[in-house]
């Protein structure tokens, strides 16, 4: 019931400019309104999507640079404890032995085991 009323009001409001438009004056192509809307969309995406992701990525890179032997990490669903740190890779102790993974593959850094 209310949805029909809501959509009827939206339809009417959408048609209002067409109903009351001055048909004698020629339509002018304006660059301003689409440019403003595009600018608003870009600002919206920057502050809502790109900026928080950039901050999260920088924080994760900082945490990866501070990795230490004994830290517990997850990589591709594998949970392990860091046994050795190399330039681009990390050796993890897991239940059945050791594996070598890339630092870039580490998705989460858990608390160090003490």
From Swiss-Prot:
Subcellular location: Cell inner membrane
Pfam families assigned to the protein according to its UniProt record, in alphabetical order: YajC
Family classification: Belongs to the YajC family.
Transmembrane feature ranges: 30-50
Keyword Transport: yes
Higher taxonomy: Bacteria, Pseudomonadati, Chlamydiota, Chlamydiia, Chlamydiales
Species annotation: Chlamydia trachomatis serovar D (strain ATCC VR-885 / DSM 19411 / UW-3/Cx)
Superkingdom in the source lineage: Bacteria
PROSITE patterns linked to this entry: PROKAR_LIPOPROTEIN
Protein known as: Sec translocon accessory complex subunit YajC
GO biological process: protein transport
Membrane topology qualifier: Single-pass membrane protein
InterPro entries named in the record: Preprotein_translocase_YajC
Alphabetized SMART domains for the sequence: YajC
Keywords: Cell inner membrane, Cell membrane, Membrane, Protein transport, Translocation, Transmembrane, Transmembrane helix, Transport
A single cellular component GO annotation: plasma membrane
Job of this protein: The SecYEG-SecDF-YajC-YidC holo-translocon (HTL) protein secretase/insertase is a supercomplex required for protein secretion, insertion of proteins into membranes, and assembly of membrane protein complexes. While the SecYEG complex is essential for assembly of a number of proteins and complexes, the SecDF-YajC-YidC subcomplex facilitates these functions.
Quaternary context: Part of the SecDF-YidC-YajC translocase complex. The SecDF-YidC-YajC translocase forms a supercomplex with SecYEG, called the holo-translocon (HTL).
């Amino acid at each position: 019931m209310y949805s029909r009323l809501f959509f009827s009001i939206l339809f009417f409001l959408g048609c209002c400019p067409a109903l009351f438009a001055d048909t004698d004056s020629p339509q002018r192509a304006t660059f301003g309104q689409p440019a403003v809307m595009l600018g608003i969309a870009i600002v919206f995406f920057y502050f809502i999507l790109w900026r928080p992701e950039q901050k999260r990525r920088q924080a994760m890179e900082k945490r990866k640079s501070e990795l230490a032997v004994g830290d517990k990490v997850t990589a591709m669903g594998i949970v392990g404890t860091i046994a050795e740190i190399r330039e681009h890779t990390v050796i993890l102790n897991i239940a059945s032995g050791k594996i070598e993974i890339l630092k870039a593959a580490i998705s989460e850094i858990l608390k160090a085991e003490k």
